[in-house]
Amino acid sequence: MSSAYQNKMVNFLDGAVVDSSPIVSIFEGRSSAKAFRQALKKSKALYMSAGTLMELSIIFIGQKSAAGTQLLDEFLEKFNIHIEPLNIQMVMHGRYGCANYGKGHNPASLNMGDLFSYALAKQMNLPLFFEGLDCPRTDIQDAMQMLSYAFDDKHSPNVPPLTDE
């Protein structure tokens, strides 16, 4: 885990990277959807790799036809998610992630879509919003964990964060 965020619990994040999995969770109405909607609002700035946007666009077109991208774009605008273009530093972080956490190299088994999010989180030194068992097996800080969310056995947030309220 990133030493800047290790074991740090906060009420709000200065910034975070968003993987495709929380957005898919929200649109599919999974049990984790409410937790992700709530948590995304607790970050001052949200970022997404252009590669992740392409991945989501393919998913949305496949599930909802070409009109699906309009729903996706509206969601990104509503949550003010900034799209970051791919650059050489991200490629280098992605290569590192693939060699150390990619399919066939580590139980994390990051796929290409995961690696776009991994690379951006590494480049920006920010935690990552994600769902699933892949990213917890990497050196990326978990944004949901930082916000004190609990998880089920598949690393889906399922309990509202602990609060003093």
PLM regions and their residue ranges:
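A generic structural signal for short hydrophobic patches within well-formed alpha-helices
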Residues: 23-24, 53, 135-136
